[in-house]
Amino acid sequence: MKHSATSSEAHARATWPLPEPTLAYFPNARFVPSDRDLDAGAARPIRGGVAVVDDSPDFGHVPVLLERCVELLTPALTRRHPDGSGAVLLDATLGAGGHAERFLTDLPGLRLIALDRDPSALEIARERLARFADRITLVHTRYDGIAAALTESGYAATESVDGILFDLGVSSMQLDRPERGFAYAQDAPLDMRMDPGSPLTAADILNTYDEAELADILHRYGEERFARRIAAQIVRRRAKEPFTSTADLVSLLYQAIPAPARRTGGHPAKRTFQALRIAVNDELDTLRCALPAALDALAVDGRIVVLAYQSLEDRIVKRLFAQAVASRTPVDLPVELPGHEPRFRALTHGAGRADAAEIERNPRSAAVRLRALQRTQAPQATGKGD
């Protein structure tokens, strides 16, 4: 056991980048493989233990569950005309624009409203989608800004959109840039902001939040079983010197997490980094606000598809979608009251998963959970008492 402790301390002090097989572990990373994905095969070449960034001009990556998204959304987008004329698709998480590009290519009459909180992502997508410029509106906002984005784009905040897509998680563009601080396999500033203009950074949390707040963040957002131990060591360490880099934090985590736990379940930093990223970007509360606004924005017969990559997000989607498809008739009545029928119907049985063929072709899809709904009634059809 003494030898094991010595080895781990040496690893904590090792030169960077650390010899990890992935750029970062995030179960909800849209494009970079997590530890879960590695069993299905490497998604990117590895050099010197670090995933190699793809700088090719083809914008890099295959969108996850693309064909399934097309299958689910196209009926709503083509109900007026086969080429999508008159239809509006809202991409709430544009990223590099992979899903959007497919829909715009397939449906030459389709209009797209696309949101992203990261201005650099918007610029990359703008270049990628340049040939569709007359049919797209790009909006710099978080996805809980759906109502305002629709209004600013000339559409009503309710019942104006035919299709909505959420592809949750961290994009490759954010993970590929060490200076953004999302990845623990390279030393970088402790930033983790999806929008670089936001005020709060991971360093701010580590250096200013009290021990109880830190433990709560690590437990709630990272499901880290050693949250209290890690929080206590963070507070002790920062009293001597503030945290400034990902290497500072990874070194502490190697010391804080017991050796047996470090040997299983992937990199010991994975849960702490996930927790900090979620806290910095207010990801879960943003999703809780965004989904009801998205459902309100759907026209009758419109459809919404959500791709989630980790359980915390998927639980939120599952709960809100279950409420949306539930009858509003009191449970003790034997018949459905007129106007109290569900306003939505589920398009999937539970959560859709990537099949073996897609996982083999695109290992990034291994963790995804897909849920989809269709609006069946307008809100005003329910009467004043609702």
Curated annotation (Swiss-Prot):
Any single GO BP term: rRNA base methylation
Domain of life, per lineage: Bacteria
Keyword entries, A-Z: Cytoplasm, Methyltransferase, rRNA processing, S-adenosyl-L-methionine, Transferase
Binding annotation for S-adenosyl-L-methionine: 97-99, 116, 143, 167, 174
Primary residence: cytoplasm
GO cellular component: a single term: cytoplasm
Family: Belongs to the methyltransferase superfamily. RsmH family.
The protein's name in its UniProt record: Ribosomal RNA small subunit methyltransferase H
Lineage summary: Bacteria, Bacillati, Actinomycetota, Actinomycetes, Mycobacteriales
Gene: rsmH
